[in-house]
Amino acid sequence: MLFSLLVIFSMALSACGGAAATEAPASTEAPAATEAPASTEAPAATEAPVGEPVEVTFWHAYGTGSAEEVALTSLLEKAATDLPQYKINVLQVPFNDIFNKYRTDVAAGGGPDMFIAPNDDLGNDARASLIADITDLAAGKLEGVNQLGIDGMTLDGKLYGIPESLKAVAFWYNKSLLPTPPATTDELKALMESGQEVAFSFGCYHHYGFFDAFGGEIFDDNRTVVADQGTGVTDAVSYLNDLYQISKTNGWTKNDADGLAPFTEGRAVAITNGNWALGDYKNALGDDLAVAPLPAGPAGPATPMLGVDGFYFNPNSTNQEAALDVALYLTNAESQTIMMNEAGHVPVRTDVTITDPLIQGLVDAFNTGATIRPQVAELGKYWTNFCGTDQVFEAGTPAEEWVKTATEAANK
């Protein structure tokens, strides 16, 4: 059973304290994103001729032109001046490719010095020695970082990344079209049945929070899959199927990417998505944008997975100290304030002051029921066996039968 997060922030936060930038003797060129090559060579050694900057290769997966990419680019331009001892080579890799590309290149002895990504698979990557243990390297350097962020980058007492922000799925709505968001799953269904378009995001990641809301569990305390015990998971899948059929009948979108246009153009009154999209929504809707927790079910709050984004380091790299310096710069109080205000990131630092009601709304939503993402190997059983909901939504398999089949397959 995943552990529910009770209090994320006593981070309602102390005075904003931007970390002091190092003195820059001369301005350097801003790092530019490049297209991803088929493979990369092993990172270059830290030793560089006197007076020449050490090269640090950095990958990210922020979408082209997104608020996240724009904010990161501004930070990297500033870093080029504030950290003249480093030349930061930036590579943008599509999100769907970044993990596989990183693993393939690292296994071949190459890869970047570091990359930023959610802690989606930190546990498996750490167990496979694909990311570096930085416990000693980062010792004493995370002052001001909330323990939740550190925990999200930690496995078995070892630190594998520098935390940057918190992310989870929430309910975004247009106040000019929907003054009050649905507080319950019944209210959400009634809203959609009334013909008001909701860009509901379907998929096993987005579905996860609804199982608890209907009293279901995927795992017991021993990590055995127990989704077929009781009716909670089946009831949740049946409910999600009801919403899917409403969306299908009305020709509404069914994923967060396709839902961007109808929501930002004012056709959809709401969308379910993570706070990585806040910047894009805010740019389009301005003061009409609001956020709330996912609607609660008959058994209690929805419990979406709470992820931690962070910087991971390549065990092949001979530039880990340089990469760490860059990562610490990109996660200091000033940098996190910029990512918060411009890209909607929820900071992991306790010395960042929240002034945006949307960020505070996310904090409140996360506190309502978000669940810390576990880094256990057994989580793979969920992704492998519970992501094929099209068998219910499109092929018409009864929810109870589908849950039973998925559970049996997971426990083989």
Enumerate the language-model features and the residues they cover.
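Hinge/lid segment of periplasmic solute-binding proteins
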Residues: 48, 119-170, 180, 185-189, ...
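Extracytoplasmic/periplasmic substrate-recognition and gating elements
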Residues: 54, 77, 81, 245-248, ...
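Periplasmic solute-binding protein
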Residues: 123-130, 147-183, 202-222, 305-313, ...
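Conserved N-terminal structural module of periplasmic/extracytoplasmic solute-binding proteins
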Residues: 17-124, 298, 321-322, 338, ...
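Extracytoplasmic "Venus flytrap"/periplasmic binding protein-like
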Residues: 75-145, 154, 160, 176, ...
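A structural signal for short loop-to-beta-strand junctions that line the ligand-binding cleft
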Residues: 104-105, 112-113, 141-173, 197, ...
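Glycine-centered hinge/linker elements that transmit conformational signals in sensory
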Residues: 192, 223-253
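Conserved C-terminal helix/tail region of periplasmic/extracytoplasmic solute-binding proteins
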Residues: 368-412
